[in-house]
Amino acid sequence: MLQTISLLPAYNKPPVATLLHPHRSSSSSPLPCGHVSPVTHGGLIMNPQKRLRSFSANMKCSSTNSIIDDTIIRNGQRIMMSEYFDVQLKVRDYELDQYGVVNNAAYASYCQHGCIELMESIGVSGDRISRTGDALAISELSIKFLSPLRGGDKFVMKVRYCRISAVRTYFEHKIFKLPNREPILEAKATTIWLNKKYRPTRMPLEITSLLDKFFTR
């Protein structure tokens, strides 16, 4: 089942139309492995510090397009892919399990939060999506756990677009613990555009134009 993404800030009530109502995960009732739970936009950190920076990535997104180093060939044009969007977060106590480490389900929320911040940075906000009457959903999420996070840990979520198509957008995620940048996680996510009937549909032209500008700048 597809998991819709809430792009609304926590202090706004989500509309009744297309976006799923967000809920905050609780350490008292941890979710099963692999479950992607909807989260509030601000539920992970009150003041995320975000910026764009260059980062040499080893993980490549599987694609039918040609990939050379950190570039991708799309429509005959070479597009740089080394630019990650950074969001700095801090582990909250309610995200821990009985062993004192971050519950595995919380990492899916971190990845979702990174996607939200990246999309809003290029102008794809919840308001813009809701005006179309459509919704954005996660159809696939693959996570590779490298090391655990614990209560009070500060970390940086690095997210970038890997590839886009008419219906789907592909993301790559990396998490590093601060300040020593210890690798914590690598993940790949696929989002899909849905119409009013929750059927896959083509992205509106205004949205694809914004994504293309991000790729080709």
From Swiss-Prot:
It is found in: Plastid, Chloroplast. Its EC number is 3.1.2.-. Residues 1-56 form a transit peptide. Its main location: plastid. Keywords: Chloroplast, Hydrolase, Lipid metabolism, Plastid, Transit peptide. GO terms for biological process: lipid metabolic process. It holds the Pfam family 4HBT_2. One of its GO terms (cellular component) is chloroplast. The active site is at D97. It comes from the Eukaryota. Belongs to the 4-hydroxybenzoyl-CoA thioesterase family. PANTHER family: 4-HYDROXYBENZOYL-COA THIOESTERASE FAMILY MEMBER, NOVEL THIOESTERASE SUPERFAMILY DOMAIN AND SAPOSIN A-TYPE DOMAIN CONTAINING PROTEIN (0610012H03RIK). Acyl-ACP thioesterase involved in the production of fatty acids and beta-keto fatty acids. May play a role in cuticular wax synthesis. This is Acyl-acyl carrier protein thioesterase TE1, chloroplastic. It comes from Humulus lupulus. The gene is TE1.
